[in-house]
Every structure is written in C-alpha cells, then in structure tokens.
Amino acid sequence: MRDRAGLYAVGTLAVVLLFLGMQTVDDQGRFNPTRAPLPASFETGPGGERRIVLEAGPNGHFFFEGAANGAPIRFMVDTGASFVTLTESDARRAGINLARADYNVPFETANGRVYAAGATLDELRIGDALIENLAVAVVPDDRLGGSLFGVNGLNRFDRRETTRDRLILEVE
C-alpha cells in the first residue's frame, strides 16, 4: 500500500512539473519564462481618462502588444532602459529603414555595452493610446532578446502607477 501511495505522489509531482515546464517553453521548445503574459486591459477612469492596465507576467515583468507604425510588436516594459529599444527585426517590421543605420550610440546594459542606431517611430499604438514621433534605439537581434518600452515611452503618459503585479498607464 505504501508503494502505491509513493508511486501516486511521484506521478502527481511529475504531472505538476510537466505543466509548469510547459508554461515556460515556447513553441520551438526553447526555455522562455515570459511565454504567456496576460494581455493588456483597457479601462476608462472616473474622470474619463483612458487607462492601460498591464498584469505582471510569471517572472514579474510587464509585457504588451503594441503596433509600431502598424506592425504588431511585443514589448517588455523596462524602467532601466532610457529609450524605447527595438530589435533590428522589429524595426524592419515597423518600416524603419536600416540601410544607413549607424550603430554608434553606446548603451550600458546588464549584459555589457551594446551599440545602437537612433531612429524615430512615426507612431506607436497601445490599445487606443497613440504616441507619435517617438525616438527609439535599434539594436542587433543577437544583443537583445526582445523590444523594450523604456522611460522615454513611459514619460509620454500623463500618469503611471506601479504595484508589485500591475502597471497602469493613464492618458487624460
């Protein structure tokens, strides 16, 4: 009887670990702790202000899907990044011409120094919020795991509020 209970416990643990593992593996089988962040929700506040509400992903980061010059791009909010930063592939999808890009702007990151090219997004839409003429940095794909929504983008909102598991961006 004890052997059966032990086998049941091991089987249950294996199923739980398999489920948790599936939550952190992307469609190509690579480890990806940011696989399934909750989608942004959009609310209207008591004074008519529009709010974008982001729920923290499993790793504590905030993600959203934006439209950069009409192209869908997934961003991670990064208050340690001075600028909205696009990977080269995301910049190309957004229609940014990189033929004459000069990667001469140094940035210090957690992974060391990286050089970026400056560019401008004509528009970035997050739900019904529109940011126009946004300065961005473009970084080679192999130097950045995904596009970042930095402080210059956050500062375009009238108000922002952060708790441990929610980020609210407000437009009046």
Question: Which positions does each model-derived feature cover?
Answer:
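Pepsin/retropepsin-fold aspartyl endopeptidases
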Residues: M1-R74, T79-E172
